[in-house]
Amino acid sequence: MPEPYYSMYRKEDVVLDKSFFTPLEGKPDHFRTISKMWGMWEASEDHWKEVITKFWGYITLIEDDNLVYLHDLTSTVFDLANQKVPESFEGQSVLPIMRQHQDNQRKGVLGQLAGHFVYFEQRMWRRKDYKLVFNATDVCELYNIRNDPEEMHNLFYDPQYNRIKKEMLEEMRAEMKRLNDPLENWVYRIIDEI
């Protein structure tokens, strides 16, 4: 990274999240394996602060809480080119968000991990209030991201959150079905068991 950007941010100004110091508590076991594989915890706190300051310049500080997918970019390119977005595209143009500050009305977004470097499938359903992670053969996760943005307290197995958990599992399954996710049929069969 060239100057003056390299020296623009001071590592002394970085305040690390609480989750930095206990990142694996209540998380699936594969997190430890991945951390070891990539050497994540061999670097010092000071080194991580240095890394963060050097990439700070990429963050625009523009905040928008619309939920978008990576595949929305394809529709956006068509929209930018004043072309009709094909009906077969699963994404939506983000131009109305960027230009008119519109709300895209998405209730949530689905994230997928298809077993790359881990021994199981993983799906994530993220709303503006909660985040649910379905780990096919390990502990599942549920976080109140408004009250616990650092995801320190896994609520998935807390009976007080059964209604939220069920609601989110059903929303996730509906989106999986819409996107033809092959794991949807399995989630459908076990949704009342977890």
From Swiss-Prot:
A Pfam family this chain is assigned to: SGSH_C
InterPro entries hit by this protein: Alkaline_phosphatase_core_sf, GAG-degrading_sulfatase, SGSH_C
Record's protein name: Uncharacterized protein HI_1316
